[in-house]
Regions:
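Conserved AMP-binding/adenylation subdomain of ANL enzymes
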Residues: 1-30, 45
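Alpha-helix capping/helix-boundary segments
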Residues: 37-39, 66, 155
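Short Gly/Pro-enriched turn/cap motifs at secondary-structure boundaries
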Residues: 113-122, 139, 169-172
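Conserved ATP-binding/catalytic segment of the ANL
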Residues: 140-141, 147-193
């Protein structure tokens, strides 16, 4: 935001939905991020009040999966796109973003919603795969679970002077500990942590 000359609005800790709605309305916030529980609380608050959040365009969410109902209600009631993201500090921090591929925009809403419910596609310069307990790559069929492994220019190559490194990497891949499925389009869905 600073690089592009955009205004940044910072929040206090432990904000209530009313505080968030007031900031969005008062500061004309267009883009914000957070965990799903924040946006569930805000949605419930907005449905019962008259705050103007029409400036808001997008909300990337991470830390947990956002319920499909949350994604759909923000889109239908407020025109806000909720975007799943997945990452870790070890990835600086974004590993995936969920967006529709161009040809998917013509799909029926139910099918698009199913895609939006996933954690997304690999970010630029991040490769990903899922492996079984024997280290074999699982198929990208949307149903075979495996541990998510990543590598790339923004992914750490080792922990500095830390014995965790030996258990955290396999053949140059960082082992995340998250269990995912990967569909034929390359979208991941976290199924266990």
């Amino acid at each position: 935001a600073t690089w592009l000359g955009c205004k940044q609005v910072y929040t206090a800790s432990f904000m209530q939905p009313s505080d968030i709605a007031e900031l969005i309305q008062g500061e004309q916030v267009t883009y914000t991020a957070g965990v799903p529980t924040i946006w569930i609380g805000l949605l419930n608050f907005l449905e019962a009040t008259e705050y103007d959040v029409s400036s808001l365009r997008r909300i990337p969410v991470g830390g947990a999966a956002a319920p499909s109902a949350l994604i759909e209600k923000f889109a239908k009631q407020f025109g806000v796109e909720i975007i799943h993201a997945w990452g870790m500090t070890e990835l600086s921090p974004i590993g995936t973003l969920c967006y529709l591929k161009s040809y998917m925009h013509d799909w029926p809403e139910e099918k698009r919603s199913a895609v939006r419910a996933k954690q997304g596609l690999a970010s630029p310069n991040v490769e990903l795969r899922a492996v079984d307990e024997n280290g074999g790559e699982v198929p990208w069929d949307g149903s075979s679970p495996g541990e998510l492994q990543v590598r790339g220019t923004s992914v750490i190559s080792e922990y500095y002077r830390d014995e965790r490194s030996a258990d955290s990497f396999m053949d140059g891949w960082f082992c995340t500990g998250d269990v995912v499925t990967i569909d034929s389009e390359g979208y991941i869905q976290i199924v266990d942590r």
